[in-house]
Amino acid sequence: MEIYFDNSSTTKISEDVTNEVVFGMKNFYGNPSSLHNLGLKSEKKLKECRETLAKTINAKENEIYFNSGGSEGNNFVLKGILKSGSHFITTPFEHASILNIIKKLEANNVKVTFLKIDKDGKVDLEHLRESITKDTALVSIMHVNNEIGVIQDLEVIGAIVREKSSRAKFHVDAVQGYGKFPIDVNKMNIDFLTVSAHKFHGPKGVGFVYIKKPNTIIPLIEGGSQESGVRAGTQNIPGIMGMTLAAKISNTNIQENYKKVFGIKERFIEKLKSIENIKINSPLSEKFSPYILNVSFKGIKGEVLLHFLEEAEIYVSTGSACSSKEREKLGGSYVLKALDLSKDEIQGGIRFSFSDDNNEEEVDYVIDNLNKGLKFLRRKR
């Protein structure tokens, strides 16, 4: 029995989306930059996809730009906006594609402010208000944290950025939130938004970035005039078609999927009450996404427990797949460290992440194997 509880790393592409990608490969192989009929046919399909995606976030079609996914999108925004002498505001537990750029930014004379967070990982809004200055060029906040699932209040944060500065831009890494929670870029005062298709049952290697004013940013990839000169390179039409269908399905079913996944997390937490020496780092509350459950199993290294579960065909993670090597160097998750957890709690952290493909019955199988694993590993220790 295979149980896949690692949906924050990536999701299984749906059958309908797979068929759409194949259809795109067979029928839209013309280069959309070509002037002949096959090229024009592909160009028209790209326009349709832009229009569909724009509607999901209340944007305009000409504000959607295709790329390879979240990491490229985050690099594009930071490197395209932040110049020498400017000021950047973010949090201490953003995705690696944000945090790993910071040393280079600081070497280029960019001042960086890390916002204070509370015990749950929510941004200290007063600190944000105090931190915005006349030099602030960009505020970058992750919508839903990829390790513990804490949800930031984008509407409030966007309002503060607008109130305090007419110059500062607001960037949202929506990789873990898009398709799971409603997003309105106008209501939330968002200037840049990054999205990755493989987090909502779409294909890997494709995503999009919303840009309110494209003339305010320097391209990351230069070359041809694709994507209105914002991002060079021939567009991945089959991937974009698959992403668009996956986005349409996910956004149409936001409430239904939320309710289903909430039930899975609720059952999981209830069953965990029978297990001793644990700490739930992402409880069942409005502050946290039901799609992510992070638990510290004290006295056990998370990686060891992960491999024990793997033997039973249960697939989980110890945190972000994009930061696994950095986590080894640090001796645990930098996200859990930012929450001031003990060394034992950090090293014993496991992330269970769900999707609408999962069901409550799978929880019982996982709990049974967790009990077996913990008894064996703790006794062995």
Locations of regions flagged by a protein language model:
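Pyridoxal 5′-phosphate
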Residues: M1-R381
